[in-house]
Each structure stands twice: as C-alpha cells, then as structure tokens.
Amino acid sequence: HGHVIGFARTGFHITVTTVFVASAILLILIVKHQFQFHYIWAYSSRELPLGLLMSTFYAGQEGSFMLWTLMVSIVGIVLMLYTQRHDNEREVMGVYTSILAFLLMLLIVKNPFALIEGNVIPEDGRGLNPLLQNFWMQIHPPILFMGFAAMAPPFALAIGALMRRRYQDWVTSSLAWVVGGAMVLGLGIALGGFWAY
C-alpha cells in the first residue's frame, strides 16, 4: 500500500505541476501577443490594458476550462495535505483525481494551444468582447471558479466514505469545505450580480 500511495502522490504532484506550467505558458503567450494560437487571437488584442489582457486567459471556453483545472489543482494540493492526516487519502484522492482527469480530458478536446490553420500569423487579435471589458472581469471569474473547485472535496469525501462503508464520516470532515466553498462561491456570485446590475 505504501508504495502505491507514494506513486499516486508523485503522479498527482506531477499532474498539478504540469497544469501550473501550462497555465503559466498560456498567460505568457497572451501577454506576448502570440496570435498564431487561435484562442489568443480570438480573445485578445494589442490595445487591451494589461489587466484585461491577462483576463483573456479565461474569456473563452478553452481558457475557462484551463482556469477551472488550475483551481481544482490548487484545491487538490490542500485536500491531499488534509487527507494525509486522516485515514481516507486513498479513496478521497482517488475520487478527486478522477475529477481532475475529467477536466484534463476536456482540455484535450478544447485545447487553448491550438494553432491557427495556414501559414499566416495575424498582426492583431479580434479582442475581448466589449461586454467583458470591465474591471470585474479580472476578479469575478477566478473567484467563481475557485468556488466551483472548492465544492469538489465534499463530493470526494462523501464518495470516499461510501467506498469505506463509513456513512457518517464525510459529514463532519466536509463541513469546513462546504462552508468555505459556499462562501467563496457566494462571493463570486455576488460580484457577478454587482457587475451585471
């Protein structure tokens, strides 16, 4: 068991590191106006100020999946540290890793690194949707996606408890995750409502 869990932890850390590196690369490509990438061409432009330019990271579906995967990775590191102190790491992290794997599969289908077809590299991008060119675009989506990610640990804890046939365990262990996730998600929704109205 110890060797398998050690390999699983190493694999999870490698996956999370890869997600961090891929996210950093995408952000660097956006800031450097690399319009040969379809996603960057479709959502950014040279005229955007730095804050809005960086927010084009998650302006489209591909980038939103990347942000979601990044947030799930961050929360996963915290969850792994939490479960290492308890006796449910194997089950909980197994379920949580399947959530991360699903998001990674979505990123394979909706690849933010897809190149524009043909040999012509555009001089400028199409730019950010005018409705999204707002200060709140820089704050609202990351908070919202962190809230989404924070709701995954209670699910993993519940399924892990079912796998162990310890049906009450997950309630107390997931309470802090539910409250914290609800607060972050509530803040994100409130900011979105403020932005919309």
Language model segments and positions:
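Polytopic transmembrane helical bundles with strong interfacial aromatic enrichment
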Residues: H1-Y197
